[in-house]
């Protein structure tokens, strides 16, 4: 069985106060990321290494000038890739905005700048301190005059090259064990001929050659694979434009051992061969 999302993905976010870090964190939380705001730079190494042994595989954290230790922050962003004890995908994000825009935002919210100086002096000082960190980030976004919905769309457009397209996770399952709660799309393939009723295939699975050869004798098997694969590609392309990160295609038969395993595996292989971002999990194959 292959585990989904085995490679942790981390967004390490910083930038100017008032530039939209909280909004970005909320957007990533909506996409299933575990989020932490205002974390001290010296604790980030511990957070990263928790991912190596926990079920949390998607993390977004904000660390910025609020801890008033810019040198620690600079060192963190320059060396963060070397801190993790396991392989993970780390995206360093820097958000900024024009000084006039930041002043307007602070006036609207009536909040105090974390540096505690007069507003203009605080912004000038922060821009000066954070400039070195900006140069070490792989994603830099200027949020000046940007509406929240536009900002989210721009962010996901900018990371598309790193994250590729929306990830499609295929799960085969047995209806007798319940539909996976995480499913976005559910396909019922119980109309296909069932190898379960043939003694020589009873204990086999949809990954075994004898079962594959049996199912491939039927026209509807090939039609099912083609239709699900084409729909999956269509949905992946459309959802990628909206900024969504992943979707779950769950394919079920009675027990989750033969037909659903075969169909899910074949669709996965087709999309994988095309270079698309996909994963496969045969949930009930060993039950």
From Swiss-Prot:
Keywords per UniProt: ATP-binding, GTP-binding, Nucleotide-binding
Binding-site list for GTP: 64-67
Signal peptide: none
UniProt keyword NADP, yes or no: no
Binding-site positions, ATP: 15-22
PANTHER family, alphabetized: RNASE ADAPTER PROTEIN RAPZ (PTHR30448:SF0)
HAMAP family linked: RapZ_like (MF_00636)
Family per record: Belongs to the RapZ-like family.
Protein's name according to its UniProt entry: Nucleotide-binding protein Pmob_0154
Biological source species: Petrotoga mobilis (strain DSM 10674 / SJ95)
């Amino acid at each position: 069985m292959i585990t989904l999302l085995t490679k942790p993905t981390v967004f390490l976010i910083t930038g100017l106060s008032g530039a939209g870090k909280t909004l970005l964190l909320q957007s990533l939380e909506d996409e299933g990321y575990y989020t932490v705001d205002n974390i001290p730079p010296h604790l980030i190494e511990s957070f990263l290494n928790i991912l190596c042994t926990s079920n949390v595989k998607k993390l977004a954290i904000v660390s910025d000038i609020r801890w008033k230790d810019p040198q620690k922050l600079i060192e963190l962003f320059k060396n963060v890739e070397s801190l993790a004890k396991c392989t993970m995908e780390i995206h360093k994000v820097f958000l900024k905005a024009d000084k006039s825009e930041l002043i307007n935002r602070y006036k609207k919210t009536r909040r105090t700048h974390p540096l505690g100086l007069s507003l203009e002096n605080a912004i000038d000082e922060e821009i000066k301190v954070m400039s070195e960190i900006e140069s070490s980030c792989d994603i830099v976004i200027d949020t000046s005059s940007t509406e929240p919905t536009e900002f989210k769309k721009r962010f996901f457009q900018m990371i598309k090259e790193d994250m590729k397209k929306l990830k499609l996770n295929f799960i085969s399952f047995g209806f007798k064990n319940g539909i996976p709660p995480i499913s976005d799309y559910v396909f019922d393939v119980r109309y296909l001929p069932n190898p379960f009723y043939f003694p020589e295939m009873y204990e086999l699975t949809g990954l075994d050659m004898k079962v594959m050869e049996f199912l491939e004798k039927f026209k509807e098997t090939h039609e099912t694979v083609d239709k699900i694969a084409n729909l999956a590609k269509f949905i992946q392309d459309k959802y990628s434009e909206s900024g969504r990160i992943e979707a779950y295609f769950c394919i079920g038969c009675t027990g989750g051992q033969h037909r659903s395993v075969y169909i899910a595996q074949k669709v996965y292989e087709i999309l994988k061969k095309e270079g698309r971002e996909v994963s496969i999990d045969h949930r009930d194959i060993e039950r």
